[in-house]
Curated annotation (Swiss-Prot):
The lineage of its organism: Eukaryota, Metazoa, Chordata, Craniata, Vertebrata. Residues 107-130 are annotated as: Flexible linker. This is Protein lin-28 homolog A. A zinc finger (CCHC-type) spans 131-148, 153-170. It comes from Xenopus laevis. Keywords: Cytoplasm, Endoplasmic reticulum, Metal-binding, Nucleus, Repeat, RNA-binding, RNA-mediated gene silencing, Zinc, Zinc-finger. GO terms for biological process: positive regulation of cytoplasmic translation; pre-miRNA processing; stem cell population maintenance. Its main location: cytoplasm. Pfam families: CSD, Lin-28A-like_zf-CCHC_2, zf-CCHC. Zn(2+) 1 binds at C133, C136, H141, C146. Coiled coil: none annotated. Residues 118-127 have a biased composition (Basic residues). Zn(2+) 2 binds at C155, C158, H163, C168. The CCHC zinc fingers interact with the GGAG motif at the 3' end of let-7 miRNAs precursors, more generally they bind the 5'-NGNNG-3' consensus motif with micromolar affinity. The CSD domain recognizes the loop at the 5' end. The flexible linker allows accommodating variable sequences and lengths among let-7 family members.
Length: 195
């Protein structure tokens, strides 16, 4: 089922003398109702396209693409759409095509949104091992919510109860391996910048 992105919607727009829609001379703020699904949405850039399957409650023979910007989404927090998410929206005809003016979930509910978040340059990924219970080592909770009684103390790096992290041979071995790696050109420049 393909979609037509440049197809004009002329219903409800004033007609010129020759009977065609007079988009350029009319008030461009005519608002229409539509519903459909999110075709795609770029979370980093904050925009995407909706595939409109109904206009003013009537099924369309050929689905239409409608531009959507994150500022038009009705939801809390980080605004985005998930591919295939059902939406209801208002839209208008602009010089660039069809453009949404407000987007909600079905029945006016807030949009669900994408689980994806934009990658930020320079931000390192959080270590998986850092988000675990210090009491039992479980990944689904922290020590204050741990249902087990206090466990014997153990190394936080390798979980061995025979030593603490300060004397951990695995951590010392990992640090030694990092020292043996060749220094990159960027790392050589760091001392010069610091001076």
């Amino acid at each position: 089922m393909g979609s037509v992105s440049n197809q004009e919607i002329t219903e409800g727009l004033p007609k010129s003398l020759d009977g065609t829609a007079d988009i350029h001379k009319s008030d461009k703020s005519v608002i229409f109702q539509g519903s459909g699904v999110c075709k795609w949405f770029n979370v980093r850039m904050g925009f995407g396209f909706l595939t409109m399957t109904k206009k003013e409650g009537t099924d369309l023979e050929t689905p239409l693409d409608v531009f959507v910007h994150q500022s038009k989404l009705h939801m809390e927090g980080f605004r985005s759409l998930k591919e295939g998410e059902s939406v209801e929206f208002t839209f208008k005809k602009s010089s660039k095509g069809l453009e949404s003016t407000q987007v909600t979930g079905p029945g006016g509910a807030p949009c669900i949104g994408s689980e994806r978040r934009p990658k930020v340059k320079g931000q390192q990924k959080r270590r998986q091992r850092g988000d675990r219970c210090y009491n039992c080592g479980g990944l689904d909770h922290h020590a204050k919510e741990c249902k087990l009684p206090p466990q014997p103390k153990k190394c936080h790096f390798c979980q061995n109860p025979n030593h603490m992290v300060a004397q951990c041979p695995e951590k010392a071995m990992q640090a030694a391996n990092l020292e043996d790696q060749p220094i990159t050109e960027e790392q050589e420049l760091i001392p010069e910048i610091m001076e």
